[in-house]
């Protein structure tokens, strides 16, 4: 009988995929901590404007942010309203967990799709601006997708891509810190690729801060960069882009 004491596995002994995930979570927590330092207050979307506003923002917050549009979302909405003083701008915060369980992003995809299609049907003259931060950027990109990857089973509540006619009601798509392919694979190896549909490409702005490890193709090297979109000028840039399209 082997009586030698067993050592607890260290990070260096874990399989490569698990080490990557461990590193990814450390980066994510560091990024979120940086975002909290930028603005520690909890933001909530403003009260709904008129039943059919001139502009409808649909925003999905990032991982761990409390319900609402989050820090980046509020900065974007504030900038957009400042750019459109003569238009009514309503805001809808996508309802989903925004948790470490990336598979639950599908809840956000279903909720955002339902909202977008509802606005298109009930308020055909309203211009929509779709936007999201981090995991929320993935959610909003997913709702624009053209097709379902082969052998991918659609989650409950999602029947397939939105009708192409919906794209005509969407003025702009602005994304902040959308997970790169490499980062997505660390989050969930079963997640479908994050792609922007062809109908939305010309009206999309996909922003990634320098050295942001979540969205940079090479991984980046500054976790704090992922939490700085509210103050690095990119929310104003995105608002200006959306303003030109509504």
Placement of each model-derived feature along the sequence:
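Secretory targeting and sorting signals
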Residues: 1-48
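Hydrophobic alpha-helical membrane segments, chiefly transmembrane helices and signal peptide h-regions
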Residues: 34-40, 142, 236-239
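Active-site catalytic motif of lipid deacylating hydrolases and related acyltransferases
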Residues: 51-127, 207-235, 239-244
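Serine-dependent carboxylesterase/thioesterase catalytic core
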Residues: 109-198
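The alpha/beta-hydrolase serine catalytic core
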Residues: 164-244
């Amino acid at each position: 009988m082997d009586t030698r004491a067993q050592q607890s596995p260290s990070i260096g002994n874990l399989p490569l995929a698990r080490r990557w995930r461990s590193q990814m979570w450390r980066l994510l927590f560091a990024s979120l901590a940086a975002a909290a330092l930028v603005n520690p207050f909890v933001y909530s979307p403003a009260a709904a404007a008129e039943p059919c506003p001139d502009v409808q923002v649909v925003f999905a917050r990032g991982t761990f942010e409390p319900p609402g549009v989050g820090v980046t979302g509020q900065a974007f909405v504030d900038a957009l309203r400042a750019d459109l003083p003569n238009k009514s701008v309503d805001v809808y915060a996508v309802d989903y967990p925004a948790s470490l369980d990336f598979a639950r992003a599908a809840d956000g995809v279903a909720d955002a799709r339902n909202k977008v299609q509802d606005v298109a049907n009930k308020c055909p003259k309203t211009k929509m601006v779709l936007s999201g931060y981090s995991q929320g950027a993935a959610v909003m990109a997913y709702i624009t997708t053209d097709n379902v990857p082969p052998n991918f089973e659609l989650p409950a509540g999602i029947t397939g891509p939105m009708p192409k006619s919906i794209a005509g009601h969407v003025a702009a798509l602005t994304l902040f810190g959308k997970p790169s392919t490499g980062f997505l694979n660390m989050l969930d190896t079963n997640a479908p690729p994050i792609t922007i549909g062809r109908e939305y490409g010309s009206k999309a702005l996909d922003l990634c801060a320098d050295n942001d490890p979540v969205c940079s193709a090479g991984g980046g090297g500054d976790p704090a960069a992922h939490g700085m979109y509210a103050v690095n000028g990119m929310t104003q840039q995105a608002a200006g882009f959306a303003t030109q399209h509504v």
